[in-house]
A protein has these predicted regions:
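Active-site loop/oxyanion-hole signature of alpha/beta-hydrolase fold enzymes
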Residues: 36, 79-119, 123, 133
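Conserved alpha/beta-hydrolase catalytic His-Asp/Glu region
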Residues: 154, 158-159, 174-231
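Conserved loop-alpha-helix segment in the C-terminal half of the alpha/beta-hydrolase fold
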Residues: 236-279
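Conserved hydrolase catalytic core segment
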Residues: 114-156
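Conserved HGGG/HGGXW glycine-rich cap/lid loop of the alpha/beta-hydrolase fold
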Residues: 45-90
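Catalytic active-site module of serine/aspartate enzymes centered on a nucleophile-bearing elbow/loop
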Residues: 268-311
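Bacterial N-terminal signal peptides
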Residues: 11-22
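Flexible "cap/lid" loop of the alpha/beta hydrolase fold
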Residues: 142-177
Length: 311
């Protein structure tokens, strides 16, 4: 069965909003499992120092953070997640995002991680907002790369979880009917809009072919029907949102997109938005120097940062 045109169009619209992700080839590095696997994700731990949790995006392996870990491992103990149903990991029952959120908080508690830095890409960026808003006294600074509190509003400024629900359910049903090969074909078709290097884009498609289509559909449906823009006001640590402007054609469009990103995090008391002018959705791959410089500056300013006491 060939994927329907509606599914293809929806995937393309998600790509425009920065929500379809895949992993890429990585360099070998020394890692170790961080204890027994949590059922909604696998963890590898590398480095030493302050804890940093890195969460990849949709149909991505945690290996997407390889260069980021290499950059930070001499100062941070990097806990890199690969989420259930993605990149060969076993799937879990719905709800997907809430389960991952709760398991990350449990992982922080069980491993006695002291206010870890949270870093997320795309779907992972959404998750770091939710984790921090749910337990604002348990986490440190937050970096979201191309992840926003409510993706639906990027595609349609008037969208709400309720107005998106019917289409989300339809999309979830259609994804459940796809094979892994079909999911891989769809991802491969859109990756050139998300990763500059064609070789990386081609390699990335292979990761989606080891992901569970039903999990991908469930995750996207949940992203369409959970709006964290008000909830995120509970976050009490500094937040850096890194957007990608590499495919934006003119200054007017750049200003509009930047304003849309600013609006997404407007309720977060301490936030910054920076745009990577030469990167597409995978900023950590297209322009790692920009991302690392932005993170170094942000984390330096937030050094030792713990949640502010709510007045």
């Amino acid at each position: 069965m060939k994927p329907s045109m509606k599914v293809r169009l929806f995937v393309l619209s998600l790509a425009a909003a920065g929500l379809v992700a895949a992993a890429l080839p990585i360099q070998a590095q020394t890692t170790k499992q961080a204890g027994p696997a949590i059922h909604s994700f696998k963890v590898t731990r590398t480095g030493h120092g302050r804890p940093m949790i890195l969460i990849p995006g949709l149909v991505s392996s945690g290996d997407v953070w390889s260069a980021t870990v290499e950059h930070f491992k001499d100062r941070y103990e990097c806990h890199v997640l690969t989420l259930a149903g993605f990149a060969g990991q076993p799937a879990i029952p719905a709800p997907f995002l809430q389960t991952v959120r709760d398991d990350v908080l449990r992982y922080i508690a069980e491993n006695k991680l002291d206010h870890p830095v949270l870093v997320g890409h795309s779907l992972g960026g959404f998750l770091v907002y939710w984790i921090a808003a749910t337990a604002p006294d348990k986490v440190g600074p937050i970096v979201s790369v191309e992840g926003v509190p409510y993706a639906g509003a990027l595609m349609n400024p008037g969208a709400t979880p309720e107005s998106s629900r019917a289409f989300a359910e339809q999309m979830k049903t259609m994804y459940a009917q796809l094979t892994q090969e079909q999911l891989g074909e769809q991802t491969r078709a859109i990756l050139p809009s998300m990763i500059t290097d064609p070789k990386n884009a081609e390699a990335a498609a292979a990761w989606s072919r080891t992901s569970d289509p039903a999990t991908a559909g469930e995750a996207m449906a949940e992203l369409m029907t959970i709006d964290l823009r008000e909830t995120a006001a509970a976050i009490r640590t500094p937040v850096l949102l890194v957007g990608a402007a590499g495919r934006l054609q003119d200054d007017v469009t750049r200003k509009q997109v930047t304003a849309a990103y600013e609006a997404q995090v407007a309720k977060i008391p301490r936030h910054q938005v920076v745009m990577a002018e030469h990167a597409r959705h995978f900023v950590m791959l297209d322009d790692p120097a920009f991302l690392f410089a932005a993170m170094d500056r942000f984390l330096g300013e937030a050094s030792g940062s713990k949640p502010e006491t709510k007045q």
